[in-house]
Amino acid sequence: GGENDMYYYSEMWQGWIDIFKSVRQARAEAGKDLWINMTCYVHPSPWWLQYVNSIWLQNSSDIGFADNLEHQPQLEREITYRDGRYYHSLCTRAWQIPQRYLYNHEPIYGTEAKVHYTDEEFEKYLYFNACRGQALNELHLSYTMMNKTKWRILSKVVQWQKSNFDILRN
């Protein structure tokens, strides 16, 4: 937070609110919908949901690995790290925002992330991400790491998540 752990809203935030309203209105007038994902330096408050569809969960590195599982496979350490960050936000800090409105950088399967999964591990990783119930998944993928099987797995998991979102979102 700011001084004395207090947050405040400034002219900058009012400007963003005006922009959110304007672009949403312009799309509505064109008969189109719009997804607004609020990503930088935002307070994770449900108050923002009157203007945006999702809010970035800014409480961790883009990718990380749990330290307490040092003898476990990389996949398990990555899933546990991210689950720990969600637990910290939603349980320890008791953020009052439904998880489906949170956005995070995941899934990440790219060269810069230094992860390498078998097809089976990749599938498990994607299902763990999907089961968290977010409405927005940004796919951080390096196409050079993908093979035909991984592309099929990705398609299968995305379709499964869409088909089950009415359950997963809660």
Map each language-model feature to its residues.
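Active-site-proximal substrate-binding groove within the catalytic cores of carbohydrate-active enzymes
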Residues: M12-N170
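Short acidic catalytic loops
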Residues: G1-M6
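Generic detector of multi-pass transmembrane helix bundles and their immediately adjacent loops
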Residues: Y7-E11
